[in-house]
Amino acid sequence: MRPKSWGWISMSERLEGKRVRIKAKGKIFEGIVMPSFTGNFVLKLDNGYNVGFKEYELLEVLEVEPFEPHLPELVKREGLPDVKIISTGGTIASKVDYRTGAVTSQFTAEEIASEVPELTEICNVDAELLYNILSENMKPENWIELARHVYKALKDHEGVIITHGTDTMHFSAAALSFMLSTPKPVVFVGAQRSSDRPSSDAAMNLLCAAKAATEDIGEVVVCMHGSTSDDYCLVHRGVKVRKNHTSRRDAFQSVNAKPIGRIDYPSLSVEWLSWRYRRGERELKLTDRLERKVVLIKFFPGLSSDILEYYHSKGYRGFVIEGTGLGHVSTDWIDTLRRVCEDSVVVMTSQCLWGRVCDRVYDTGRDILRAGVIEGEDMLPEVALIKLMWLLGNYSIEEAKEMVKKSVAGEIEPTTQY
Amino acid sequence: MRPKSWGWISMSERLEGKRVRIKAKGKIFEGIVMPSFTGNFVLKLDNGYNVGFKEYELLEVLEVEPFEPHLPELVKREGLPDVKIISTGGTIASKVDYRTGAVTSQFTAEEIASEVPELTEICNVDAELLYNILSENMKPENWIELARHVYKALKDHEGVIITHGTDTMHFSAAALSFMLSTPKPVVFVGAQRSSDRPSSDAAMNLLCAAKAATEDIGEVVVCMHGSTSDDYCLVHRGVKVRKNHTSRRDAFQSVNAKPIGRIDYPSLSVEWLSWRYRRGERELKLTDRLERKVVLIKFFPGLSSDILEYYHSKGYRGFVIEGTGLGHVSTDWIDTLRRVCEDSVVVMTSQCLWGRVCDRVYDTGRDILRAGVIEGEDMLPEVALIKLMWLLGNYSIEEAKEMVKKSVAGEIEPTTQY
């Protein structure tokens, strides 16, 4: 018999994380109840495998011993660089959740080292749990707080790692790229599959991120799987990277730029693939204000330019448009654009994502430029959005109009890479 | 001396398309004035080359003989299939513009055949100039008119080709995919480089499109360069294709599906790469209403859900959200989503573009589903938008909620292709 649901909450969800004994298919099974994505009742058995059941009989909910880590104290190794790991939540931090039934990770250095012991051969780890939130809930306020914590950590560590949910990791990486001028590596890392799954990318990504954090890098980067195998990670510039797949482990790709480098696994040997800010090249500096009233609008055939008026009337002075092709919107947007451009910064990007905006080729584009719109060059729409939040938070409208065209953190390449 | 500009209109633009004689670099040049993308004064010389000048002296504006094509009359070849070419404008149709100085192409069958004579070996061409507009100016009204013209043409032709600007070609292809059930091929084709440039893709794309229009296909497709070389075109399903580069000739890619086929050039041999609707498989049927009050909203960290209320209060009942990752928005959107879902259809897609939406994995996703949002599976956001315009134009809200989850024109693949 399959237990019925109470309203929206199924039996399986009420038992999530608990140890149970059930009868199914004529046998007895014991294990931890896992979140069910399919409507099945899923158990993690002691051998590590997950098994799903359509029909089962619940025999017993077992008491679990309170989680006592008993982890050995970490001893600092001489000669290894100090690296700070700041956790913000997401799949990569959900490691411990269903192993013990505990839903929230403690995220101590000892815990991380016991999960991924190879880390201690690369660096001396400090750990800090800043947030435990899903990355779709990250807000500009969180970026500011995170930037301040990273700024502080950079003063007495050789590098900083930020574990982050993958949904908005590239937004956060772009935000920190603008807010922080850093002489040391700041490495975002996440996982597409949680650590309780055999295909998890959490440990390998973290090891490669630790390697990156000790390397000759002086900028904010994202380090994630470079292929669907466990053979290498890629290090992407924080302002040129995008999540381009909902579930693949190699979902993160550099767009309109080569990745900065490649870190082979398990050798952790590094190959540089592009130019980069080097360690010590820039001074440590925090410029951490962000203007919230900036909006990204994706154009489509038939979309009325009223949406520009709507945001403008609410006090928005920063607009990023995701236009078509080389950077176009319908001709009937031009009048509204001209009015909005009088006291606002409007940046044109392309929903093609790859390639460079060029509004000098066709009539519509030239009209858009005459209206006062600024070409976003080869910037990703998401990056242009955050750049504008940062510019309008720290500079005047006129300064922002000049600076948005120029590369601040490597977000504009001089020529487009194919 | 470089002629000064009058307001926004430069001398070069006033002369565009006219034949002139100038003095520059100590020599005399004669040719047709081309649109200038760089601020230079550009002449197309009689040998076909374009030359740009920074400084020049205008000597004479020459009268041009009225354009007399003197084209041989096309004779229908027995045994070749009849194909209708409908022109809507865009780069591919700009072929004739600056060859003669005429700004608008006549777009007769004779003209096309004289430009691309190999066409007459593939099919007997009929031609119709429906629009001459840049594709960023296409509107849902144009899709309806276009669908009606194609519907009519399909009755007495073996296939239909639509020449179209590339900016929104994939939107138009998706629109016709839903509006037209077709037993014959309907082939969209465009060019990324206009025919007066040596690197133009116009002729090859048109020849491959003609081949596709005579093949065993019974659906709406897009036929464009498959690589940056002139070696093959790909035939993409109209509801699985997207322009993914601002300028590359192979900008169009199938997303979350394999292309239907590959047409080698110049052999025009066809290789099928995926399933397809076959010729004669479906009845000819036109379902051509579209609801305009449907909107696509791209989510980003910090975006307020007020935007949903704004459109809802204006009578919008169709919403496509471009969420993050597997299909997420911030948790503080849930209450608004629940209210909007009461009388509207809200579809979740992913700004990752590649991969499938799955809101059953994480808490936020499950909350989104409970609010009444429907998973857009592996549909592109743009395709989900147009599908919803079509569903709400022709069916009730309740019917639309059911149909949006099911594949109508091949827009949802049973499993995601990697």
Curated annotation (Swiss-Prot), chains A, B:
The active site is at T91, T166, D167, K243. GO terms for molecular function: asparaginase activity; ATP binding; glutaminyl-tRNA synthase (glutamine-hydrolyzing) activity. Its EC number is 6.3.5.-. It catalyses: L-glutamyl-tRNA(Gln) + L-glutamine + ATP + H2O = L-glutaminyl-tRNA(Gln) + L-glutamate + ADP + phosphate + H(+). CDD domains: GatD. InterPro entries: AsnA_fam, Asp/glu_Ase-like_sf, Asparaginase/glutaminase-like, Asparaginase/glutaminase_AS1, Asparaginase/glutaminase_AS2, Asparaginase_C, GatD, GatD_N. The keyword Transmembrane does not apply. One of its GO terms (biological process) is amino acid metabolic process. It is an enzyme of class 6 (ligase). Residues 81-407 form the Asparaginase/glutaminase domain. Keywords: ATP-binding, Ligase, Nucleotide-binding, Protein biosynthesis. It holds the Pfam family GatD_N. It comes from the Archaea. Heterodimer of GatD and GatE. Allows the formation of correctly charged Gln-tRNA(Gln) through the transamidation of misacylated Glu-tRNA(Gln) in organisms which lack glutaminyl-tRNA synthetase. The reaction takes place in the presence of glutamine and ATP through an activated gamma-phospho-Glu-tRNA(Gln). The GatDE system is specific for glutamate and does not act on aspartate. Belongs to the asparaginase 1 family. GatD subfamily. HAMAP family: GatD (MF_00586). This is Glutamyl-tRNA(Gln) amidotransferase subunit D. The gene is gatD.
